[in-house]
């Protein structure tokens, strides 16, 4: 081990020394360039669309069944193509958990430009780009192109992937699997027929950007990136786009055994033209005998159709019923519709006009309903791990709750099925419902699995014995603030850890969010169940640390659902205070202008105005800051720039009672954060990477676990919660010797009060027992990485002509910025 450390220090010293570059010591190998995806090469070999006939297997599968926490989304599979209908928040996470391959997804269809349908699209596009997919085609409302333009404000240029937009007015689309027809549908008299929480379009004269958020003076107006239009678009909430999808004809299968019985030259080159002829429906003559095509082939499948239609409210019913394109597919034997997917609320389904429209498709057409009445567990792995963690400490790791459906669906005279996560309808080879993939949540199985793990029960019992000397649970749980970790992973949502979001319950009736990544509302639903509206009603402010997608793309859904919650609680609506980099306003402004009205939801406080010594020139901002402090009962809300991307901030909350919570956001070790957080009661600090990956941490401007702990110790924080782990540590990070009695590890849905600080370190042994297999795998990966580094060090030493034994090497402190790599700290 001493020799290993010596070699690693030698390699580190040479790579960081002056006059040498990092490239001279190949400790980190560049990733090989991605080859073209295999399915694309296979497609090229098959030739133009339709040349080989239709696919053998086609099915539709429910990704999200329409519940309030998950939205509605549909996945369509064939061996040639993959399709996704709608992409709300959390869809990428569900596809990853249930192994629905994102990398094969080359077509996304959107039924309307509403956040419930597009909230996960920006993250999905970034993931598709990372997989190497060269092109993705998006179909839907005309604002779709402007939406893709707007997300560049925070994603940057989307190089490496071609995003082709097919407007709803374009002619039909055809590929190897099917032909897709887009049907635009406009509501009748849309204006004025809305529920208060649905964010109807207001006249522009009543809602200028200045009126919607008086927090910014002209000097604070955000500047849009190059290529992003500043012109106001035409929002159209009265438009939805339905899709009729017609499968290509599938030629019959050649009956080899029957051909042998007839004496045909099976197994020779002469059989090829015979097969081609009979598959085309032509008869052949063999030895003077005419053989009909149906004697040698199974019957062809003419290709059924399926329909995907969204009917958001009753104002769309009549236009749908009167649509001529739908009428051509209703009750026609030559164009059978196998399935109609209805994304519609109960108020639509019980309407007699809509029911009559459904009946006109005929008795052989199946109907699938996706709406909030569909009760289905979606995030099974999250429920599993929480059930097992609950065995360790039921208060800190509370059980999750499924968001309840309201009531039984309406009784209809057509074959109707309510959606469930992973429910399938197979269109080919035979039409049928398939329920074998539907997930079931069985807590008893999760508990038995955990209790059978070696040393788990023993470690839990030992922890409980050691905890008896602590304060009584009732005393601990009555304290505020209460910290709820809703998302503790980095970069992209994954099956166990969602992306950044932390709820701080300051008091029973006041809370704020620290960051708000994609899927935050869904996490709130799973944590609070039917109490989620009450929690949204207490939300006073949101802090957004920076404009990376994993920290802010859940904000819009929180805003929309909060308005709905206030209406259901009978509370008056008022804008939510949002503390964020000024650039967030540019994104919200673009989405507001082009897609959906949202600016009336926020009152914006630029994060830079809360820095120490910042001058506030706008009286409006001063009023908002005063309101923030008064509403949250805070003595101070301070921000500082941290060492991550441009315009990245950390924050410190100082309560009037004296406690202080500091949140790092994303950052490398940062002196400004240390100064701002001095004597914090609690530091929540990102710990994206494990120890030993300091160089990667610098490259990605993040912190390792020991670096995060060091920041807390220098800050003199009473306790340190590590957060924002790389998804390579899906269940638990690697523990280091620096973990002490002042350090805890955050998990999704973890609930922590200040009275739990003494308990947190005692949880580590049971956690190690629960995740022993995962820790072993991570340690093996670390050993392999260190072995590669040793080999690289030996090679570097050999190339350098060797070093004298005992030559001193000064290991560079990883909390300082290497001279060899200039990292911008804003």
Swiss-Prot record:
Where does the record say the transit peptide is? 1-16
Superkingdom of the organism of origin: Eukaryota
Keywords linked to the UniProt accession: Endonuclease, Hydrolase, Metal-binding, Mitochondrion, Mitochondrion nucleoid, Nuclease, Nucleus, Phosphoprotein, Transit peptide, tRNA processing, Zinc
Q: Give the signal sequence positions.
A: none
- GO cellular component terms attached to this protein's record: mitochondrial nucleoid; mitochondrion; nucleoplasm; nucleus
InterPro entries in UniProt: Metallo-B-lactamas, RibonucZ/Hydroxyglut_hydro, RNZ2-like, tRNase_Z_dom
Output this protein's name. Answer: Zinc phosphodiesterase ELAC protein 2
What organism is recorded for this protein? Pan troglodytes (Chimpanzee)
